[in-house]
Amino acid sequence: MKAISYVTNEQIENYARDFYIATGKKLTFRTITSKLFEEEYQHYDIPSIPYEISWDSLTDAEFFALLKALPIKNLFANYHASSDDYIPASPIIPHGLDVYAIYYIQNIKDRRHAHDFFEINYVFSGECHMLFENETLTLSPGELCIISPGSMHDVYASDDSIAVSIMIRRDTFENTFFRLLSQKNLLADFFRTILYSETEKANYLFFTTNNSSIVHDSIKTIFMDCYILDSYSNTCAISRIHIFFSILLRHFSHTIQIYNESSSVANQTNFLLILQYIQNHYQTVSLDSLCAKFHYNKSYLSRLIHKNTGRNFIDIVTDLKLSQAIDLLTNTTLSIADISELVGYHNVDHFSKHFKKKYSCPPSVYRNSL
């Protein structure tokens, strides 16, 4: 008997299917992998993983076949759970990695659980079901869900489905997703409020990508750097995640839906539209024009903005104007008057007064100090 060092997704899937057919019951992933490793015999040669090509060159069919052949280490070998429903990044994300991707195996028994990392679920084909405390979300092909740490949920893929999960350590998510929004702090603050609400209630972002090939290719390369392990793998995987989020925000930000247990999907999504409108029209938007655009009365909209951002409308718009002014002062040779006009101030003295109040010096002094 030779010591077993890995099992494949296909072996786990076959074991789960055969047990379910024989008994009508499902086993957990941990139980199946433990049983396979206890057999202490590997029936297959080590899977051949393509090293010489980029996985985004694989067709979807080739990639799906590769997913089933990927080797899975004994993740739970040295793990002793302190809670039945809370799973930390270790053992799920291997030591030394900040990103890890897995394929959802059918006929696996799961349970509602939470963890301390971010989880991105995506469906290539079929359906993937996510069960939250008071809601079930079904993902169809091309749909994607980002689940926040601490959210209690259960996930299972329907028969003959291809669904994957990308798991990202919390600090890595912070340094990729929110960094991309660094010049749109209004949106970043709102997403951060939703995703870091420190509750067991459901908190997630939902995207529709129309089964885009660019999304497929990006996910394939993330998997590549999770399984072809060398001294560059983790750095490359983090870079791939950065690119992946860039693709989502560039091409599919208009499809974002937000769910937070404390508020309905519609309310959160409508407020996101309000923030996006403020972000895109900060030079000219007024509270009156915003109310007319979204059909709210002024007092209600003021309270809604403060509740979701912790700031009032005037402060938000002023910060957006001055943040853009800083960028123009730093990266262009435009005159102070031109910058004032571009960011929405039609009186340069008024602009300078606001700028000095926030940054403790007038715009000209700030530029000369660079």
Locate the predicted segments by residue:
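A long, hydrophobic alpha-helical segment
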Residues: 215-234
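Basic/polar phosphate-binding segments, predominantly the helix-turn-helix DNA-binding elements
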Residues: 284, 288-320, 340-366
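Short, Lys/Arg-enriched, Trp-marked, Pro/Gly-tolerant hinge/linker segments that flank
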Residues: 206-208, 229-237, 248-276, 280, ...
